[in-house]
Amino acid sequence: MKSLKIFRMAHHQNKENAFKSALLSRGWHESQYQASQYVSFGLFDGDWPSRKSMFDQMNGKPWFLYPHAARPMVQYDGCVEPRRDCRAMFVSAPAGVYLMEKIGYPCEVVEVGWSLCPIKRFFPRATADRITFAPIHPNGNTFLSDVDKRLNLEAYRRLVKYAEKHESTVTVRYVRDIKDNGLAEAMAEAHPNVIWKQAFPDGSTDDITRADLVVAHQTFAYMAVALGVPTLMMGEDVPPRSGSSEAGFTYVQHWDDYKDYMIYPLDILDEDVEETVQMAIESDEPIRDWKANFIGQPFDGDRFVDAIEERL
């Protein structure tokens, strides 16, 4: 009897779409059930302890990881204990392979290309008239650390000053409740240069492509870089961190070993905002190497499916 080509997948903010489409195009089918004896493998975005039941339901079948976020999963450096039974972790770019090796991730890592949006050449701007600011968003349980709230507020204050001077418009694209982003008081000020827009972490890019400058953190910022839109990140020198409460909040353990490689070169919290914005909008030279390492090449669906099938 010919084996059935059925897989189980965890969905996360549409980040699974390219992987799922590649599998479907090669004759695989997604199981509609959490547990099924006919499933050949699982494809998940994370392996933290809260998802133990998901792995138990695999009944020993192989499983793989696709990227939970655009930034490589350096939280495995002391914040989260990785499971050791992952058949392979798929990553978007060379940085994912390098950093997982650097922190001693115990399972195989396979680069399959950037999957979250198209990769486009940089398009310079003369001015930053339209700025999209995407604050660091709270977890699903509404928790956001005090350090991230401070970063959000400081970045916002700097952008407002810049907007006042240059008559720019800042659209604050926030996820979940504004108070959980640490910006409730800022919203109450009703600044004339600021538009507040509640959004969803669904992979949409409209607020990126209509902007002259994007200021953000992690996935939204990485997508802006991929799309060729001038981008500043925020608090890049602060060690990566993880936690769903203050009690469980931790930083990575070996940040000094790889921070120079990982830090995005242009940060809104750098000393001279005017100079940093100008560098961001006029050329991609400062971030070209970073983009090659952290965005890399477009997603290769056949390479991904081949890698799955070779490991079953």
Label the predicted regions.
Residues 4-119, 221:
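Active-site and donor-binding regions of nucleotide-sugar-utilizing enzymes
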Residues 16, 117-185:
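Conserved catalytic-core segment of nucleotide-activated headgroup transferases in glycan assembly
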Residues 27-36, 197-207, 272:
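Short acidic low-complexity segments
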Residues 35, 40-43, 66-70, 112-115, ...:
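Short loop/turn segments at strand-loop or loop-helix junctions that form parts
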Residues 35-38, 87, 129, 209-213:
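Conserved acidic residues
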Residues 176-222, 226-227:
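Donor nucleotide-activated moiety binding/catalytic core segment of transferases
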Residues 219-296:
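Catalytic binding pocket for nucleotide-activated donors in carbohydrate/polymer assembly enzymes
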